């Protein structure tokens, strides 16, 4: 069995026996023997085999995966693999990913156990030990650096393909421990090196890796950099890959997760609103979240929009959707102005008093029958002018404001189409 592992180094190919060696759940240990050929890394490989054997023995005793000893063995397994990987080509990449996934699962399990012991009220005294996931992330980051630093000109051998494998593991890990600063920094690294590493993305034959990478890059561009075009691009590509597996019931949760973030990007970038009836049939959980928002956008109902924000504030903040959804308010206001303009007969001269009443009705606030009844009437009109000025400055409305006459002058066709075609 050991000879089959050694042959992987001679032939630069990954075989099933080597993968089985790394897998702690595969209950078969290997006896170390001398290789039948010269193997420069023999001492390191010997050490790796011994660690893997001990890892399997420990797991067999504690199959629930909640042992600190198991964690330290898995951590050392990845460290030794890193030392071997530094002098090898990318044939070992999936092996390191396998080891990293295994390490993540053990660390996550131990952190969950520790969190239950600490309790929700335990804030720590500043002397607590690092979490297992943080320790695991540090070693995974070493793997990532090994991948990034490869200067091999042969694309089929270069370790840079590994940045996507290990990078997605780190994305998942940072997201789990809510280290959003580290997650965003990682995305910045990928962004700055994408011309260099981009060609390797198409060479990955594991769609799960591609889905994870594109998803987190979509979140980074769309929700951190407010680049809705790139956010939409990455998330749409993620969803397109996910739909290839829609016949598999277990993928429904993943597709729903992607849609939750894709819909706001589609609205803000393309001005395309989801059709609620098909959405309710196919993704009822997603439709439940966005029905109120979509209705407010389509009708210009500010009261409904505010209710959506109020009812879902905690959820939106937790999912990092809050700021993005707030930016949709001007689209609700635009729809309301358009409806008021139509009710005004499409005249190019639109009194601000009339628009102010439309806003009051839409917000569900008392509507004053006569002008200047309310003591804050001028203030309301000033606030309305600010809203209209913003819409005009963004070319959502073709027109201008006359502050002295309290009117908005528009062109004959003041509302240019904002929807963009979907490019494939």
Swiss-Prot record:
InterPro entries: Csn12-like, PCI_dom, WH-like_DNA-bd_sf. It holds the Pfam family PCI. Coiled coil: none annotated. It is found in: Cytoplasm; Nucleus. PROSITE patterns: PCI. Residues 224-415 form the PCI domain. The lineage of its organism: Eukaryota, Fungi, Dikarya, Ascomycota, Saccharomycotina. GO terms for molecular function: double-stranded DNA binding; RNA binding. Component of a COP9 signalosome-like (CSN) complex. This is COP9 signalosome complex subunit 12. GO terms for cellular component: COP9 signalosome; cytoplasm. Component of the COP9 signalosome (CSN) complex that acts as an regulator of the ubiquitin (Ubl) conjugation pathway by mediating the deneddylation of the cullin subunit of SCF-type E3 ubiquitin-protein ligase complexes. The CSN complex is involved in the regulation of the mating pheromone response. It comes from Kluyveromyces lactis (strain ATCC 8585 / CBS 2359 / DSM 70799 / NBRC 1267 / NRRL Y-1140 / WM37). Belongs to the CSN12 family. Keywords: Cytoplasm, Nucleus, Signalosome.
């Amino acid at each position: 069995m050991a000879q089959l592992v050694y042959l992987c180094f001679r032939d630069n190919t990954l075989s099933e026996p080597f993968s089985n060696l790394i897998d702690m759940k595969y209950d078969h240990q290997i006896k170390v023997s001398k290789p039948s050929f010269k193997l420069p890394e023999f001492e390191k490989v010997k050490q790796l085999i011994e660690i893997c054997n001990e890892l399997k023995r420990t797991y067999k005793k504690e199959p629930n995966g909640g042992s600190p000893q198991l964690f330290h063995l898995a951590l050392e397994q990845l460290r030794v693999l890193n030392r071997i990987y530094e002098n090898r080509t990318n044939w070992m990449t999936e092996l390191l990913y396998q080891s990293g996934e295994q390490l993540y699962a053990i660390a996550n399990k131990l952190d969950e156990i520790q969190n239950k012991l600490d309790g929700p009220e335990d804030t720590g005294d500043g002397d607590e030990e690092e979490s297992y996931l943080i320790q695991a992330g540090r070693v995974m980051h070493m793997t990532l650096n090994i991948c990034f630093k490869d200067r091999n000109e042969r694309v089929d051998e270069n370790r840079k393909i590994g940045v996507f494998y290990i990078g997605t593991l780190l994305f998942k890990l940072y997201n789990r421990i809510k280290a959003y600063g580290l997650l965003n920094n990682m995305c910045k690294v990928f962004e700055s090196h994408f011309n260099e590493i981009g060609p390797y993305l198409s060479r990955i034959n594991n769609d799960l890796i591609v889905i994870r990478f594109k998803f987190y890059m979509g979140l980074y561009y769309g929700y951190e950099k407010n680049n809705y075009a790139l956010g939409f691009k990455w998330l749409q590509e993620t969803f397109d890959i996910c739909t290839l597996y829609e016949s598999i019931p277990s993928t429904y949760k993943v597709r729903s997760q992607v849609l939750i973030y894709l819909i706001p990007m589609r609205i803000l970038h393309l001005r395309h609103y989801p059709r609620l009836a098909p959405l309710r049939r196919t993704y009822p959980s997603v439709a439940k979240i966005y029905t109120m928002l979509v209705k407010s956008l389509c009708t210009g109902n500010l009261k409904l929009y505010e209710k959506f924000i109020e009812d879902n504030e905690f959820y939106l903040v937790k999912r990092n959707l809050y700021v993005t959804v707030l930016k949709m308010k001007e689209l609700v206001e635009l729809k309301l102005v358009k409806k008021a303009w139509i009710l005004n007969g499409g005249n190019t001269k639109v009194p601000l008093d009339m628009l102010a009443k439309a806003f009051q009705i839409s917000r569900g606030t008392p509507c004053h029958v006569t002008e200047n009844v309310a003591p804050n009437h001028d203030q309301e009109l000033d606030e309305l002018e600010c809203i209209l000025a913003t819409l005009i400055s963004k070319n959502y409305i073709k027109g201008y404001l006359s502050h002295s006459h309290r009117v908005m002058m528009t062109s004959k066709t003041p509302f240019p189409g904002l929807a963009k075609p979907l490019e494939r």
